């Protein structure tokens, strides 16, 4: 069985940070080929966070990501999972459509941004969010969980955009472990 995991980082949250590093490691352990995307250093150091500021950054990231994926023979894979964080969640959902992979991809969305929520009705997958995420209002997180209970992987009370609580290293490690265990259940 041929399997692929594509890793979509956030703005400052690169593929070497804990949530993406360990989810990619688990996918590799389960026999998935790993593609780690890079949007460019200017995007990884971008400081804007409002939807208006993020929209052109997302478009630029997609423009830079498409060439990294255009020669991937997606039809040859038996299972494809998009593992994403922050703006990567919106990029992953948009690319599922742009690459004509609707229904062929499992989405694993960590700390989605508000623009990702509109895709929840169309995806096959799970999302994970913290209630103290400064980029996602808590009310939107709970509404998404109510509207899409089968797509809610976990809501982390009091956790920020990295699914951590300041000053609680052991709690952060526990959250990473819980997320990796959820991913492991999705992998074939």
Model-derived features with residue positions:
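Short alpha-helix in the alpha/beta-hydrolase fold that links the catalytic acid
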Residues: 20-21, 136-146, 168
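Short beta-strand/loop motif that positions the catalytic acidic residue
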Residues: 121, 127-129, 133, 141
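Acidic catalytic loop of the alpha/beta-hydrolase fold
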Residues: 131-136, 161-162
